[in-house]
Regions:
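Beta-rich carbohydrate-recognition and catalytic domains
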Residues: 1-2, 10-190, 196-244, 252-256, ...
């Protein structure tokens, strides 16, 4: 079965958006490929052409496909089997120290990396890989840089108790093994968020607890913790929804924080909602 999956958008200039998406055969018969296509805000039309996104590793520059991502990680000791699909621009895009930063991920392969997007906005370059402990099957991370320069990523876990794991790095290249932290407990296997707005970090995570009316464990509760230093955290928001509240994205525009979130019965994604956080 084929799919166009996991869209991401970045603004190129006042008139143009660049839209990224993965095109994949989820049966694994061929390598998936990430593409981009530009959208003209003046004419409200897409360019007639689509283009392949490229991947730069220590070994060279290749099409952004899972086999090249896996080969780069294997050079650093990654031992999980290769997957032909599931490579996504997961956590994007953040401006940090003059660079456009993102986290990329192969979901079925439990593979993650910190990366940059080049100035031409057509090539992803890997900075460093974080995949340990392998038995936790880390995936779908969100990353930011703390005031002391340390990189911190919160990762979804697909094994064990499935609570979120945190990995850190001083240089973005060498990372610590993932560990749980006490301010995030009873986490569920769903994508987290980690943003910084006006000097405040916003860290969002899915909770696996049952909600008040007795519905079962699922993506019904989403918490947002805030911190100025990335060390001391406090709860700012708790969203509860019978029909799920999952995979939100938060963005700041004109002094306000906006969000888009998916919702649906039984944890599916029947609709997308848009709103103002603060």
């Amino acid at each position: 079965t084929g799919a166009c999956f996991v869209p991401r958008i970045i603004r190129l200039d006042d008139h143009t958006l660049r839209c990224f998406f993965a095109c994949e055969d989820q049966g694994g018969r061929r390598q998936s490929q990430t593409w981009y296509r530009d959208f003209d805000l003046r004419t409200r039309t897409f360019s007639p052409n689509i283009h392949r996104v490229r991947l730069r590793t220590a070994e060279g520059t290749f099409d952004l496909q899972p086999n090249h991502f896996h080969a780069a990680a294997a050079k650093h000791g990654f031992k999980q089997p290769a997957k032909a699909f599931g490579l996504y621009l997961l956590d994007s895009f953040k401006q940090i120290d003059g660079r456009t930063i993102l986290a990329i991920n192969n979901f079925p392969g439990a593979q993650n990396a910190l990366a940059t997007l080049n100035e031409a906005r057509d090539t992803i370059e890997i900075i460093g890989h974080y995949n340990e402990p392998a038995e936790a099957r880390l995936t779908e991370s969100s990353v930011n840089r703390l005031p002391d320069g340390t990189w911190l990523a919160i990762c979804r876990s697909e094994s064990g108790n499935r609570n979120y794991r945190f990995v850190t790095s001083k240089d973005g290249r060498t990372w610590s093994p993932g560990e749980e932290r006490p301010f995030v407990s009873k986490g569920s296997n769903s994508k987290p968020t980690f943003d910084k707005f006006d000097g405040v970090y916003y860290l969002g995570w899915q909770e696996a607890s049952r909600i008040v009316d007795g519905h079962g464990v699922g993506r019904y509760i989403f918490n947002v913790e805030v911190s100025r230093d990335g060390v001391t955290w406090e709860r700012k928001y708790r969203f509860e929804a019978i029909e799920s509240f999952q995979y939100p994205t938060f963005r700041q525009h004109d002094g306000s924080i906006w969000f888009a979130v998916t919702q649906g019965k039984g944890g599916s994604t029947d609709r997308i909602m848009f709103g103002k956080l603060e």
